[in-house]
């Protein structure tokens, strides 16, 4: 069994190097990846292939892919939390994520589970062109 910190560091290294697809590939074949919120990208992805089939089209729209900064990695047994931020350019404008949290559970050489917390308004505006007005 691979050490949790090693798996998480591999994920972080890929994201920091701009290799987001390779980072997401660490999800086990039968792993579950959840993106919080109600954006078109939000939801539960069951398995690596489902994640790629449904999320990759949105990721491929970036004019400038997000550049990540990791502020902290917290590891406890098979669980880890990665705190990060990113800046990029979506098809509709700047993509600024001041706070990400990736809550993970490692099994074997990959992730059995990832829950991604992010600023959903940033996703809606930069990736889908949605503007928000007061009700």
List PLM regions with ranges.
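A beta-strand edge to alpha-helix "cap/lid" segment located at domain peripheries
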Residues: 3, 56-135
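Residue-level detector of alpha-helix boundaries and kinks
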Residues: 7-8, 36, 40, 89
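A solvent-exposed, acidic/Ser-Thr-rich amphipathic alpha-helical stretch
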Residues: 21, 28-77
């Amino acid at each position: 069994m691979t050490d949790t910190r090693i798996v998480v560091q591999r994920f972080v290294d890929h994201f920091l190097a701009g290799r987001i697809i390779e980072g997401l590939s660490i999800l086990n074949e039968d792993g579950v990846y959840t993106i919080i919120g109600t954006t078109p990208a939000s939801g539960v992805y069951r398995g690596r292939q489902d994640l790629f089939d449904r999320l990759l089209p949105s990721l491929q729209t970036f004019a400038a892919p997000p550049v990540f900064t990791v502020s902290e990695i917290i590891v406890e047994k098979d669980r880890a939390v990665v705190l990060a931020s990113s800046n990029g350019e979506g098809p509709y404008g700047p993509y600024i994520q001041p706070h990400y949290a990736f809550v993970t559970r490692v099994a074997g050489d990959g992730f059995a589970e990832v829950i991604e917390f992010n600023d959903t308004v940033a996703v809606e505006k930069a990736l889908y062109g949605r503007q928000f007005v007061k009700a």
